[in-house]
Amino acid sequence: MSDQFDAKAFLKTVTSQPGVYRMYDAGGTVIYVGKAKDLKKRLSSYFRSNLASRKTEALVAQIQQIDVTVTHTETEALLLEHNYIKLYQPRYNVLLRDDKSYPFIFLSGDTHPRLAMHRGAKHAKGEYFGPFPNGYAVRETLALLQKIFPIRQCENSVYRNRSRPCLQYQIGRCLGPCVEGLVSEEEYAQQVEYVRLFLSGKDDQVLTQLISRMETASQNLEFEEAARIRDQIQAVRRVTEKQFVSNTGDDLDVIGVAFDAGMACVHVLFIRQGKVLGSRSYFPKVPGGTELSEVVETFVGQFYLQGSQMRTLPGEILLDFNLSDKTLLADSLSELAGRKINVQTKPRGDRARYLKLARTNAATALTSKLSQQSTVHQRLTALASVLKLPEVKRMECFDISHTMGEQTVASCVVFDANGPLRAEYRRYNITGIRPGDDYAAMNQVLRRRYGKAIDDSKIPDVILIDGGKGQLAQAKNVFAELDVSWDKNHPLLLGVAKGADRKAGLETLFFEPEGEGFSLPPDSPALHVIQHIRDESHDHAIGGHRKKRAKVKNTSSLETIEGVGPKRRQMLLKYMGGLQGLRNASVEEIAKVPGISQGLAEKIFWSLKH
């Protein structure tokens, strides 16, 4: 396996959805295309110690990059895999020269037609559906058809010599035309017609006919037959899942966008004649502070109005973003193409699902890109370089949360070389300060955290103070006054302040509470780890504050009632299902709680009411 391809890091980013994957060598050539019901499971199998074959070993040894395209159904993945193989001709895929070598599904012309896989010349009388990319795809489809439309798949030699139905009939996978009287000629012919329509991509017609038959059976009080047809309808719907292979012959590009950590991904899904031909993710360079709208508008303009891209303009473009110059863009594209080009940002129905697919792929590709480019270790290495430290093995970050100065909670989160160390996260209830005094709260939590003995392995290399210069000054004062046995000068104190509009990527960092701070580029791995730990600390503080506020809300009303101590409060809330249930209870209901007398129940009742 290539030293440059980090399979472990890549697999952490892969989804378990169905889709298609493309493997590239050092020259950027696609060397293998595959599909999977579960992308994560399938791709993981390539990086086991005991590979299945020498071919797989040779393939894996050349992998430099893997791209994935998520699909909503396995059928989509199959179609997309076929298109990619035809497009790239990867040397590790089985490449067949002409359609004679491709397998087909064969529907025979017998009195009772059968389904089978067929290769080679088409001499036998019947209908051929395909070609399919490989035998596995045909066998998979035949197994599916057998569950929904139970027509026979046995050889004629078996069919002609049966006196009683086989196991396939017993388990509902065949109607048993081999034995007279088990199925009528009309019913069998109807199921064959359903198969014919289904394999022709006309599943809507199949559903329409089945629904009509179900309604007729129901009106005739044939409820058992109606239930059987209902089950068949549900099976067809489950399989088709309203696949993104349009019968209307859509000719369009679908553009999904994802934006995170200063990086944008624009994923374009190419659809021609209603078929998904393929897709590609683009990662435009994004200057710091750029709005997402500018990223999208600039990309779309460059993509279609420059170079040779205009030669492949579709009839319609679906966008995941509402452009301010949508009309101008559409007019420009129409003029270049010499025909009407529509730009749509709020599609409905199937087209909205196309857009959802592009959006999903954009998010997946961006997650993978960010992870591959900046793992936690890489980010910490980058941070150490920025801070001029030999290494950063441990970071701690503090944040304060309160509501109008009440129920103040401070949080401390810890990162080590592998990222968040959640077992060591801590919350501190802040008391004895003036309401809303965040400086005093920060002073208190730092003294409680560091004013004691600390094991050498737990001394942080960096302490991040969320809040800017004022909070950093408090931290500096606390550490100057600490009288501890461990090296209090080892941790580097770093203040971080959000930009004026509090946008991620515009943070200012401070080494000292005086003077100017400095900023890092929005795509800097060092900034990403700072944002990560700061956001973790913020979420941890808010979570603790909400719990504290909820606890106060539930208990404060009871704490003022004489004779109701902690144990009785707990018992009352437990039996009544919370404070609201207790407020709605009668005196008699309250008196039934263990440990609550009639007199105390009346006191509780009137205290809560008044």
Swiss-Prot record:
GO terms for cellular component: cytoplasm; excinuclease repair complex. GO terms for biological process: nucleotide-excision repair; SOS response. The keyword Mitochondrion does not apply. Its main location: cytoplasm. This is UvrABC system protein C. Coiled coil: none annotated. The UvrABC repair system catalyzes the recognition and processing of DNA lesions. UvrC both incises the 5' and 3' sides of the lesion. The N-terminal half is responsible for the 3' incision and the C-terminal half is responsible for the 5' incision. Belongs to the UvrC family. SMART domains: GIYc (SM00465), HhH1 (SM00278). Residues 204-239 form the UVR domain. HAMAP family: UvrC (MF_00203). GO terms for molecular function: DNA binding; excinuclease ABC activity. It holds the Pfam family UVR. Residues 16-94 form the GIY-YIG domain. Keywords: Cytoplasm, DNA damage, DNA excision, DNA repair, Excision nuclease, SOS response. Interacts with UvrB in an incision complex. It is found in: Cytoplasm.
